[in-house]
Amino acid sequence: MLTEEEKLKIYAEFNKSRHWDYTDELIFDFLMSVYKESKPEDIIKLKKDFFFVEKDILKCMLSLEKLDIKPQYMSLYARRMNSKIFKTENPTIVFDELLQFTIKSFYLLVFSLANDRSDENFEKCFKNCVMLLELQGNRHELATYSYEKLVEMCKYPKNILDLSMDAYWVSWTFIVAHELYHVSNNTAESSYQEELDSDKYAYTVIINMIQAQKQGKTPKDLDVFHEYLYLAPLMMLEFFKLLDFYNNLFGKKAEYIDYPSPELRQEKLFDMFDEYIPDSFDTVEGNGVFNCFLDEIDFIKEQLKLKKENGELDRIREN
């Protein structure tokens, strides 16, 4: 039987990262041309370690949670909408790039639509949404874009970019904390209940990180754990609910047998609020962000259903 180290080596060999398709010079030029506030020293840090943000968050999380482990972090493109952990001597978290880019794109299109419901922006966001659901959600293929298209896509208002990326990092932290919980269990395969327990643990980590940032106990560079994003993990689960809704329009009903549904995962997280959300939390703004997010999801669902009925969705889907 293969050891966890051998499994990881094989997994990494057959699932190369997509990040290395780009040269350092291309990344540098892209960031400097798109983000006016980009600082050369920050980009130099990025060039030295592409995953320095992930590693900084992980280090902060381990310290706050007093976890006596030294996990490694890997980003690979295995075309799986998940993350996983290999229980090697130093546990290795593998975050699939399909999931990374899907969550980022999902937040950008939803928040962009909330900010601008003009016909032009709606058409762009709707097409991006269908592509996200069909290409990445169903076919598990990352979309590819030209350099010019990437620059165009990044011309979002700064507040939308900041909100989307902060929501992404909170969601990323939730997913990683979920995986770390599995390390404490010696079972070969995680159970249905263990998945829910992992969610519960991960959400307590999010609350602790938000509390720590309020108290000045997190690095200033990691200014992403805001009270108004305390519901980010639930926003992330909206993508999987939307994917199920989309597939149901085409007669494909989702079945959850060995793994809890996104609805159940949300329900269990909501059940934690009375006990785990501190009284000192200002939840008003966070509830507002979440409700605004849900309004856009409802609008997208209405448009998906409408365009399926008139045949337009099939045309968009095929292009």
For the regions a protein language model found, what residue spans apply to each?
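Long, well-structured alpha-helical subdomains associated
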Residues: I207-N319
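Hydrophobic alpha-helical membrane-insertion segments
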Residues: S105, T187-A188, T204, N208, ...
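Alpha-helical scaffolds flanking conserved acidic
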Residues: M165-F174, E194-L196, P219-P233
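Active-site recognition of the HExxH zinc-binding catalytic motif
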Residues: F174-T187, D199
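Preference for well-ordered, secondary-structure-rich cores of eukaryotic proteins
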Residues: V94-F95, E194, Y256-P260
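An active-site-proximal "capping" alpha-helix that borders the catalytic cofactor pocket
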Residues: S191-I210
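Hydrophobic or amphipathic, alpha-helical segments that drive membrane association/targeting
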Residues: M1-S171, N185, F281, N287-N319
